[in-house]
C-alpha cells in the first residue's frame, strides 16, 4: 500500500509526519473522508469545499493545494484501487511548540486509501448488519467552543463517547455507534455519523448548528426533496428516535445504515429507508460507474 505525503508517493510503512507537526501535537488539522467508486471520488466538489471551509475556520485558507484531486488520483492509481476509502489530511505543518500558531503556514498534506467493496446498484454494504446504537453520557462539545462544522483532527469528543460504548459492551451487546446529545439533552449525531428517523411518513433529522453536517446527510436531504417527502429538521429528544417507525445513520463509508436498536429498544428499517438507500445507490451508479 502506498500513501501520498507532501507531494510524494511513499510506502505505507515509510509514511510519517514530523513529531513537531501541529496536526500530531495539537490536532491542528483539517481532514475529509471520501469514497471512491469505479475510480472516481463521489461528491468530490462537496468534500473539497468543506475541507477548504475548515481550513478557513482554522485561519489557514491557502493550505489546501491546488493539485489535491491529482494527488488523490495518483494514490488510487498507485494502489490499483477503483473502489476505496480515501482520507485527505491537511495540517498546519511543523512549527515550534507554542500553542499560538504562526501566521505563515507550510502545510503537511497526506492522502491515505484502503480498499472497499464495489458500491452502486450492484454493490454491497461495508457494514455487516443493521446498526445497534447507544446513547452516551458524553455530550457534544458546543459549537461555541469548537466550531461544529469544522472537520478537524481533534476527535477526543468522539473517542470519549466510543470508550463509553466499550464499557457497556458485553458478549451479547456490542453497540456499533454512540449517540451524542448537546448540553441541553437534544439529540445531535453519532460519533462519525448523522442520524435520521421516520415517523408517520415524515423524515426527521437534527438541525445543523451543533453537529457536523455530513455530505451524505446533505445528499439524503436532496434525494428526499426530489421525491417530495415531508422533511423536518429541528431539535429532538432521544425518545423521538426510540419511538420512530424507521431510523438510519449516514456517513460517507456506510452510506445509509438502518438502525436496528436504540438503547436496546427495537426500531428497524422500513419503506422510506429502503427507497432512500436505493436512490443513493442509483446516484452513485450513474455518477461513477456509467
List each model region and its residues.
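Helix-start/capping segments and mature chain N-termini
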Residues: 1-63, 100-290
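Active-site pocket-lining segments that scaffold enzyme catalytic pockets across diverse folds
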Residues: 66-122
